């Protein structure tokens, strides 16, 4: 079967994010003219002839601007920046914007100076509308997540990097799969400043994978694979040439995961993967750092059904509660304090998180007295955490 490769007649390079949506090719450039561009064909000749530089970014290299992904409802485009990419000015933020290092003990920076001067928010995820406007900060506290994907429930997942030189230290954090919810902070801080996952104001991973170099992430939805593999999230590791199929199980308002090695070869430096909606095959690329670039295809051969999956996951009620609270993640949200307060003592960490963020985004004058007088132990701890983060002594 002949593969046709057509070089686009466009004056851009170093694109680490590519997305065709809404009649345009959206490009996130990592290098000269870094940031988000929109390429369109204005005269119908099947060539992109217009380049709109929508959002400049400061940052580059392997920790620079990364992936672009379309939301399930196709109304938003999500964009990633690694921890060497300064978060550009956004119009709104569902993350409270007074982030800081929040360290009690003196930090030891990396002995070789890596990211020694990088401070919060670290790596980030933002989104903008289909016109390239109305930018909003979604989550922070990553190290260097290249890519992301939505699962069958419309929930977002990303695969974050470790700092390999930290291996064996108490502050080492392995590469990990994150369930990225509204207003999340995953606690990356440079050097020894990384937050442990028991901190109440950071969210834990869905799964710790181990040493590696995270690159592409994709959902199996649309693949002509058995149902289990259609529902999986695939995480690609450049260093070890491994693609992991992550099988998600609902756990309250979030998920846990089980990992299966799906494709592996130490000779293949995998970079990204995608499901082709026309033939139902998975395609993945290999290359990087001057190595040979390749395109590979994965298809299923067997007797299991490959009908498209439609069933949603269990625990929909918990996710519904969390999402109703996330709808309050905006300043001056009417009645947000009263609506969210009863969930501050919930036994699910992600529901408590969503409730606390909704409250933190409101003026403290609306809820400081409630926080100081709350009697329920768990609700009191969550409310006082919010007050410690947002109140003024």
Regions found by a protein language model. Give the residues of each.
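Long, ordered, helix-rich scaffold segments
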Residues: 287, 298-393
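Beta-propeller domains with acidic blade repeats across secreted/periplasmic ectodomains
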Residues: 1-327, 358
